Amino acid sequence: MDYFPIFCQLQHKACLLVGGGEIAERKARLLLDAGALVTVNACEFAPQFHHWADQGQLSLISGEFVPELLADKWLVIAATDQLSVNALVYQSANQQRIFCNVVDDPKRTSFIMPSIIDRSPIMIAVSSGGKAPVLARLLREKLEALLPQHLGQLAQLAGNLRQRVKQHFTVMTERRRFWEKLLTHDRLAQSLANNDHVQADQHVEQLFSAPLTDRGEVVLVGAGPGDAGLLTLKGLQQIQQADVVVYDRLVSDEVMNLVRRDAERIFVGKQSGHHCVPQEQINQILLQQAQSGKRVVRLKGGDPFIFGRGGEELEELAGYGIPFSVVPGITAASGCSAYSGIPLTHRDHAQSVRLVTGHAKKEGQLDWANLAAEKQTLVFYMGLSQAGEIQQQLIQHGMPATTQVALVENGTSRHQRVVSGELSQLALLSQQVSSPSLIIVGSVVSLREKLNWFSSRHHDDQPKVTECVAHVG
């Protein structure tokens, strides 16, 4: 360990900053955020320093650095572009046993300033010891994305409750269980994120009055269309906190690799014509796991409320009083169209978009006349087996046979493949792809050649329609 990690209490402590430029300005912000009494020494000062001085937030001393400026200082930072000045600051501070940081000079530094994630009072520091500051910054950015903004409020709330918890729960195991419930309470977290402190206080009171026996919950999470990079931050947080993850065939391996390692995984994959697990049994799995006190994530491809039967599953849970919440995902229509270079709406082509299931209930009848109207884009989910019917009905109800269509197979993944042609060829084209595939119908498909960015970048095989038709024939 090259450096001993330590957090300093600088509230009302005198600190010296040598330098008046842009880098010094960044260091000054950090010192001011920490509540330090900051004195800045430089020959020239950036405008922000004068603003701070006018506001009484810090003091300015104009002129060359002299060692006497270190009197009564707790620490000093040298942030000038003159090596000789920085060296003098370090040497003088060292002689007086004052911690000194010289920016970008590890050899003349007695302490380093790491990359920080500030969720006060939670503070996280990342340092490479000056060896790879860019790597430290990249790690900080990843952590910044993972940690919710309300984390500091949650920590502050926990601190305010410590004494009350000690008095209310005399047994240590009960205290631990209470803290676990409070710190993983989704609705409390959401209230804090919304700055709704009244609602947050209500959730806290419910936790104090509720029995400490484990009570599970279900979080319905949309995994997106395939590319793990399209999983939302909140979705990622949920799958990394889950005790159990119930997932289906449309959830990519890349997304599943992000699930908490010790979480139980239950596969309930479904596909057209073959249900590995009946929907009623899936409902029972969710119910039983939640009733046993587990934190359950129901992970669905795309968005769970768009042809994902998420509403049906939650209705079942609601009937038994099981707490639940929903994390939306990027639906296949949005992901597949974007990764195929096909805008769903365009001022010159389509003023509306319709999402249509290819597997409605048998008694359901689509309004084909409206679907065949001009100036709109149609996106059919689970429509491969019905491609012939879709082609026939749309043409029969007035849509031109030359209308452009595209079929997107394994959209947004590295295995994505797109075939395109005319509506009159849809049935034949459907034989060139396999499930999961999405059907897009509308003149916006004609923009694909111009806007296709993903397949050209990944060198995907993109067979032409003429090749598909010739192959089928």
UniProtKB/Swiss-Prot annotation:
CDD domains: SUMT (cd11642). Keywords: Cobalamin biosynthesis, Lyase, Methyltransferase, Multifunctional enzyme, NAD, Oxidoreductase, Phosphoprotein, Porphyrin biosynthesis, S-adenosyl-L-methionine, Transferase. One of its GO terms (biological process) is cobalamin biosynthetic process. PROSITE patterns: SUMT_1 (PS00839), SUMT_2 (PS00840). NAD(+) binds at E22, I23, C43, E44. This is Siroheme synthase 1. NCBIfam families: cobA_cysG_Cterm, cysG_Nterm, PRK06136.1, PRK10637.1. Its EC number is 2.1.1.107, 1.3.1.76, 4.99.1.4. Residues 1-204 are annotated as: Precorrin-2 dehydrogenase /sirohydrochlorin ferrochelatase. S-adenosyl-L-methionine binds at P225, G301, G302, D303, I306, T331, A332, M382, G411. The modification Phosphoserine is found at S128. It comes from Yersinia pestis (strain Pestoides F). Pathway: Cofactor biosynthesis; adenosylcobalamin biosynthesis; precorrin-2 from uroporphyrinogen III: step 1/1; Cofactor biosynthesis; adenosylcobalamin biosynthesis; sirohydrochlorin from precorrin-2: step 1/1; Porphyrin-containing compound metabolism; siroheme biosynthesis; precorrin-2 from uroporphyrinogen III: step 1/1; Porphyrin-containing compound metabolism; siroheme biosynthesis; siroheme from sirohydrochlorin: step 1/1. It catalyses: uroporphyrinogen III + 2 S-adenosyl-L-methionine = precorrin-2 + 2 S-adenosyl-L-homocysteine + H(+); precorrin-2 + NAD(+) = sirohydrochlorin + NADH + 2 H(+); siroheme + 2 H(+) = sirohydrochlorin + Fe(2+). SUPFAM superfamilies: NAD(P)-binding Rossmann-fold domains, Siroheme synthase middle domains-like, Tetrapyrrole methylase.
